[in-house]
């Protein structure tokens, strides 16, 4: 089973919005046997015994009352620690593969909750936005975190995704949360709420202009941007080349730009040029909204 890369937040939608795109995929294969427990093997790297996939399975067994002996192999082609939901996608792909192999029925919310809990292995605390996107596909808005609930939209949007080759920041998610402001002025709150409304309306209506307005963020992104190599230049060049909106993908360092189809290649080239002028190597892809791992179940 495959689970796609995701970009969470998309500007003002901090912790509640994610889009699934076809820039990268994680794949997982399972064999189900007797007993109760999970053994996970990662192709090409070893994240250790307490990884997101193992924790996700333990939580899934707890939530559903289902427990089988499961062998899991994960091939994760999503760049790790780049703000593209790699750890969550691996967990979602593995859970989806198990559900299919075991022939069981379950609520998608159980997968989202289990995989979100599994993120404690990578981020220190549960996160549900990326895993919801990887599981459901399209654009997902979390309407409740406890209990998990959501709405899913299927907008037709095109993005340019820039992934710089920079040294991974230790405990990136934790660090990038610590830099966030503890409070904001009321006027800022009102402006930010308007942006969130625009973002969600744009995703629901497949309206790029509304989505782009919601990709502006003066709270979270303003605090994080100084820690992201090359971001200011990438953002500037992308807009000059015709991007409609630009934001960090998750906590970065990857960047996602919303584009019209006719400007996609120009924006991709501009983002590559911006990284080059910053002395950074990068992979930059044109990507579209895609389905999640649970779509075929």
Curated annotation (Swiss-Prot):
Gene Ontology MF terms in the entry: ATP binding; homoserine kinase activity
- Residue positions annotated to bind ATP are 79-89
Q: Which GO terms describe its biological process?
A: threonine biosynthetic process
**Protein's UniProt keywords contain Kinase:** yes
Report which reactions are catalysed by this protein: L-homoserine + ATP = O-phospho-L-homoserine + ADP + H(+)
Q: What is its EC number?
A: 2.7.1.39
Could you tell me which Gene3D superfamilies the record lists for this protein? 3.30.230.10, GHMP kinase, C-terminal domain
* Protein's pathway: Amino-acid biosynthesis; L-threonine biosynthesis; L-threonine from L-aspartate: step 4/5
- Keyword Amino-acid biosynthesis present in the record's keywords: the answer is yes
State where the protein is found. Cytoplasm
A GO cellular component entry from the record: cytoplasm
Q: What is its main location?
A: cytoplasm
Q: What does this protein do?
A: Catalyzes the ATP-dependent phosphorylation of L-homoserine to L-homoserine phosphate.
Cross-referenced HAMAP family: Homoser_kinase
Regarding protein family, the annotation reads: Belongs to the GHMP kinase family. Homoserine kinase subfamily.
Question: Record's NCBIfam families?
Answer: PRK01212.1-4 (NF002288), thrB (TIGR00191)
The name this protein carries in UniProt is Homoserine kinase
